[in-house]
Design a protein with these regions (language model features):
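Long amphipathic alpha-helical segments
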Residues: 1-142
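C-terminal regulatory/effector modules of DNA-binding transcriptional regulators
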Residues: 117-277
Length: 277
């Protein structure tokens, strides 16, 4: 809801810096971001006179931050990339940075690699840096120890984990009990552990078409777990770019972004059935 609200204000003509400052002001008045009641959800911002004064000078928009991160990583300039991301996290909510800066940067890097504009080494460095940066955030997002257990993993043979890491961070910040199971999970072993540990929901991420056959096998096997299979969801770039592939996967498509997946997870777990042991 928060990201949709920010986008609605920007779409209605408000500068993102004003929207974020407004959100900060609302959070301060409500004694915390989780207590904020967001006004103007229909996309109409308050009149300019009602918005808080801009409190940040020389704010760069998300597009400039994306370009800065990409250029720094392709120069192997880790220090500059870190400085830009630190700036971004200081300006915007974490979820906004994930959806509007980290994800677009990753997409641009991937597209440039596919076009042959950058080397495999450059792509690996950039992707690994972003994964490591998110892993630091993940360790700081403790989540909860109660409620339905959610497992998040990358598909078998899937080595790109940024999307899955973002999802785990968002879910924990939303109050869910989440375990991140890693990338390139083995089908048979994962099914056995799911049968034993009995998570309420399993969410799987994929980015490349060549992982789809194994992912299809895995989701079908998860659906056959007795006496009660977990809820199964899936998502990732490959399903945005090739929506026809969704027909081969058992379970629910969780949406085009990690943040949409959080909202769909909330809805599915409310509907049940789920386990809490």
């Amino acid at each position: 809801a928060m990201i949709r609200w920010l986008k609605a204000q920007v779409d209605a003509g408000m500068a993102i810096s004003q929207a974020v400052s407004w959100l900060d002001s609302l959070a301060e008045e409500a004694s915390g971001l989780e207590n904020v009641t967001l006004p103007g959800l229909n996309g109409s911002p308050l009149r300019a006179a009602q918005t808080p004064a801009q409190t940040r000078l020389d704010v760069r928009n998300s597009g400039a931050l994306v370009r800065g991160v990409v250029n720094a990583l392709l120069r192997f300039d880790e220090q500059q990339a870190e400085a830009i991301l630190t700036e971004a996290f200081g300006l915007y909510p974490l979820e906004y940075v994930g959806e509007e800066i980290v994800t677009p940067a990753l997409v641009e890097i991937g597209e440039r690699w596919h076009k042959g504009e950058i080397s495999v080494t450059m792509e690996h460095f950039a992707t690994n840096y972003l994964s490591q940066r998110l892993a630091v955030l993940l360790r700081g997002a403790a989540g909860t120890q109660t409620g339905p257990l959610v497992w998040v993993a990358c598909a078998p043979s899937e080595l790109h984990e940024v999307g899955a890491l973002l999802l785990v961070i968002y879910l924990r910040r939303a109050g869910h009990r989440v375990h991140y199971m890693g990338k390139d999970i083995p089908v048979e072993d994962f099914v056995q552990e799911t049968q034993r540990a009995r998570p309420a929901m399993v969410l799987l991420s994929a980015s490349m078409p060549d992982v789809i056959p194994e992912l299809a096998t895995l989701t079908a096997s998860l659906a056959r777990i007795e006496p009660q299979p977990p809820l199964v969801g899936y998502g990732g770039r490959v399903f945005r770019e090739h929506p026809e592939l969704r027909d081969s996967i058992t379970g629910m498509y969780m949406g085009d972004t990690a943040y949409e997946a959080v909202e769909n997870t909330n809805e599915r777990l409310r509907m049940g059935p789920h386990r809490t042991e």
